[in-house]
Amino acid sequence: FVNTIRLLINKAREWNNKQSS
């Protein structure tokens, strides 16, 4: 369960970084 949340956060963070660029 925690692994899934961490993966989701990582993906969201990467998305934010890509959108911010």
From Swiss-Prot:
It is found in: Secreted. Disulfide bonds: none annotated. One of its GO terms (cellular component) is extracellular region. GO terms for molecular function: toxin activity. The keyword Nucleus does not apply. Its main location: secreted. Expressed by the venom gland. The modification Serine amide is found at S21. Keywords: Amidation, Secreted, Toxin. Belongs to the cationic peptide 04 (cupiennin) family. 09 subfamily. This is Cupiennin-6a. It comes from Cupiennius salei.
